[in-house]
């Protein structure tokens, strides 16, 4: 089968289905994905198999959480007319390629992945001494290579995973692609990382319980902002503050317009405004951003079949591209499903 020609560079990225997404997910990835749709051929997936690498003991919420992520994908602006949006587990070719790549990937490569040691140290309440957890970077590589992605948008913490994918692609091509390389070596598209604090001032993360969710209604957003930590040096209302060391100031830099940002800078530094007023302006900016998303999200919440149909249509497109790649992989390895006469067979 001849692969479909690519007119634009192809991008692949995905998110684990941990439930509803938060502002950190939006700023760190989703916002950038939406912008990329007009420039690249985009494949975006909910990587539900990856959820099993750490949460294998309880899979009861994987499907529900996957739908929640899909709602947020669509509400934020991912367009099924511009991008292929799908569930990883519905494309079995990911698993087949993962199996084949695992045969050629040295254990040492996996053990040196920075996030492997970090997560083993940080997640103490789960047994992560499993083959699946050690090998999840190979599954991640299969996710990328199955679509012959040219580029992968990632944050700095994921650069090592893309580098591993390049090494695996290079090794596969070295073994089986002498006549013609099967896989391109994907390039990293580094996502600009804005500093987005949670309500306690640390990095916004579900594990810290400090998130503002994309689906949070306005009263919840305003309440969360009211409790958000501020410049520790500003003890009294009359004390001047510094928005450059204040988590609320960081929110303003990302979400507020220039006029509001100017008022925050002048008012905070001169003690002309209090933290309550400053937090109210930040809440205004978040509500303005999230209200349209939440209106779009409600359409899918009220009729989940709409989102499911989009995922199913995306799955068909993804399987077509993945199937073409697997034909190339099997052919290169001499394991084609089609009958091929032995090379030393005599002509009849």
Which residues does each PLM region occupy?
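Short helix-capping/linker segments at secondary-structure and domain boundaries
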Residues: 107-111, 146-153, 256-264, 294
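Internal, conserved structured core segments that host functional sites
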Residues: 115-118, 123-172, 176
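Non-catalytic, well-ordered alpha-helical scaffold segments
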Residues: 95-99, 136-139, 162, 245-249, ...
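Conserved nucleotide- and phosphate/pyrophosphate-binding catalytic cores
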Residues: 23, 166-348
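Short alpha-helical patches at coil-to-helix transitions and adjacent helical residues
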Residues: 26-29, 94, 158-162, 248, ...
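N-terminal Rossmann-like or analogous alpha/beta NTP/dinucleotide-binding catalytic cores
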Residues: 2-12, 17-142, 294, 298
């Amino acid at each position: 089968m001849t692969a479909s020609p690519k007119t634009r560079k192809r991008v692949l990225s995905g998110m684990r289905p941990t439930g509803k997404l938060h502002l950190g997910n939006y700023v760190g990835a989703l916002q950038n994905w939406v912008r990329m749709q007009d420039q690249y051929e985009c494949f975006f997936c909910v990587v539900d198999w990856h959820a099993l690498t750490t949460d294998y003991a309880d899979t009861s919420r994987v499907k529900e959480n996957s739908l929640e992520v899909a709602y947020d994908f669509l509400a934020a602006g991912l367009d099924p007319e511009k991008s292929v949006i799908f569930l990883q587990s519905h494309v079995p070719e990911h698993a087949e390629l993962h199996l084949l790549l695992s045969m050629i990937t040295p254990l040492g490569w996996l053990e040196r992945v920075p996030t492997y040691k970090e997560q083993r140290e940080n997640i103490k309440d789960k047994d992560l001494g499993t083959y699946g957890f050690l090998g999840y970077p190979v599954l991640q590589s299969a996710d990328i290579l199955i679509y012959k992605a040219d580029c992968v948008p990632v944050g700095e913490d994921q650069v090592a995973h893309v580098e591993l994918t390049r090494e695996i692609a290079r090794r596969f091509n070295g073994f089986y692609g002498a006549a013609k390389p099967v896989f391109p070596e994907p390039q990293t598209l580094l996502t600009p990382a804005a500093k987005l604090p949670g309500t306690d001032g640390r990095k916004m993360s579900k594990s810290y319980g400090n998130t503002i969710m994309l689906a949070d209604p306005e009263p919840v957003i305003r309440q969360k902002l009211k409790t958000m930590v501020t410049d520790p040096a500003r003890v009294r209302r009359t004390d001047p503050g510094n928005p450059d060391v204040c988590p609320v100031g960081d929110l303003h830099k990302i979400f507020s317009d220039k006029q509001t940002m100017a008022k925050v800078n002048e008012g905070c530094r001169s003690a002309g405004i209090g933290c309550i007023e400053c937090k109210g302006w930040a809440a205004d900016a978040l509500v303005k951003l999230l209200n349209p998303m939440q209106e779009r999200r409600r359409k899918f919440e009220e009729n989940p079949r709409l989102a499911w149909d989009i995922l199913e249509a995306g799955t068909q497109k993804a399987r077509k591209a993945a199937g073409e790649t697997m034909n190339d992989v099997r052919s290169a390895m001499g394991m084609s499903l089609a009958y091929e006469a032995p090379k030393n067979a005599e002509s009849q």
